Amino acid sequence: MAKDEIHGNNISAERIREIADMLPEKPEGIGVTYKDRTYWDKMKNTPEARKLIEEAHTSLKDGMPPFVDSLYLHLNKTEIRLPGENMMNARYQYLWRLVLAECLENKRRFIPAICEGVEELCRQKPWSIPAHDRNLHNYHGTDYYVDLVVATAGNTLAQCIYLLDDRLPAETKALAMCAFREKVFRPIYRCLEETKPFYWFTVTNNWNSVCLAGVTGAALALLQDKEERAYFVAAAEKYYVYGMKGYSDDGYCSEGVGYYNYGFCSFILLREEICRATKGKIDFFRTPKFARIAQYGKKIQIMNQVCPAYADCRAGVSPSWFITNYCDNVLGTAPYEEKYKIPGMDNLSLHTIGMFPHQAWKVEMTPEIQEVLKAEADELHSCYDEAGIIISRPATGSTCRLGVSVKGGHNAENHNHNDVGSYAVVMGSQTMAGDMGGPFSYPGDYFSGNAYKYPIKNSFGHPVPFINGQCQVSGKKAQGVVLKKELTGGTDIFQIDYTSAYATAVPELEKLIRTFTYNRAGEGTFVIEDRFEAVSGISFETAITTRADWKMIGNNRLELVLGGEKMTVDIEAPGVVEFDSETVEVNSPAYTRIGIRLKKPLQSGSVRLIMYPSRP
């Protein structure tokens, strides 16, 4: 198919020509084609490769999973996402698996099925998932929209075509190019030059990096004309800054660790695609902010690779080993031995760098970047002042067994939960109490106006107060104003005023102060204290959220047991307290909300939770 004419005004024609002069004569993907038998024969003997080849033979026997219209349309009828998404992903993963198996085996055994699979995907109108095609424009092929999955699956398909090189017939490649122009390249060009940019071009969350990496990678791998390729590089150069605004200037990712793994991994991919194509002439890493973002994967860990599961981070998620290793390699912050392996099939394009050698284009080490790296070294603390996040750890070799994270922030963050005043308490490799994270899969209305009906997202499912029967309110004005931050080698104190998080819901409330105190002495102690004042008596309840088994071991004492660890919680409060418990389960492992309620309404008072490792 002939190239598309480039004659828009949004992306500078002069910049397109400048970038075109930097690009290679022919399109190039990530990694090496099947012809590099030194690489592929070496990989063939790895356990991951043997497993993949075995799975590919099973897939070949079963055939490509069908496109099922009723499953694609299921979401609009039921608000349940997974059936349609699983159907789409199974089709993509079938093809990726066969392509990698063919590169490994080099016997042409999978080529006929691969060609049929490529042709099926080209005939399939939507490449998006149903959640991003509510109006069914992609499904009907009337007005194509590029979403996260079009970008990532499209890039993976483009990389597969590059890897197979001349193994694919010219007719199959031509059909694929027609599909890419229809579903990816022309919709991007049209929205940038003729209508208005898709929302993700200027959004400040993971969508920006994910979609830019996918579209740019596909263009660099497929488009023969240098100026066409340069157009997509220039577009990425113009718009990537919006995604970076989603990280605070000190490097914090408000979407949580899981979306850092997704979004920043995508940004790394985008950076590598463009660095390699331009031989380092364009490098998005050349600022101090990116050095700070690169350090987030290490700084956010409390201890033993356990991280706080704030926002929509899934419980148990740790920073990607690839990201931390890649950043060490790029910045020279730790000894680095390059490792590469066959990845899983999910979001394959995001993991192609880690599959091949020569993974990291070294960043130019400026004095500003060097200064950032010097400032990051603190074994006991990590601080993100802009986000109101602190990590406090025990000293290496000490008797202290507790590590904690505490949170101020506000209630208008990316993938927001209403959770000002939240925290996480870790013993060993277990999160004993605190923020329990987000869903493992999203309900269909999770990103609608109904989202805050879910306790996993509203403050009821978090370890924060429930006052006069009211949860925290949403919005940036609902914030934790830092009153005190004292971090030492022994005791850390962090105090916030978060009255504003309840002010409009509980007008009687005059003041609500939460003080966190972490003490490294002995085996460690963590105290959460709330002090409140009101114009009249109010009902006051706080909560412990946990996936531990728990029991009362005294009138005002609880014990939490999880993964071989035991933690005691003492409750200090004026008068009698009442306890209740409730199970919270929203498409994620269930957890318990233990409500701790003052029996009588009070005009002022305080509640202290004192947590420490249980003693024999």
Language model region names:
Residues A2, A151, K341-N347, S441-P616:
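CBM-like, beta-strand-rich accessory domains located in the C-terminal region of large
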Residues F264-M432, L487-G489, P601:
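Carbohydrate-active enzyme catalytic cores, enriched for enzymes
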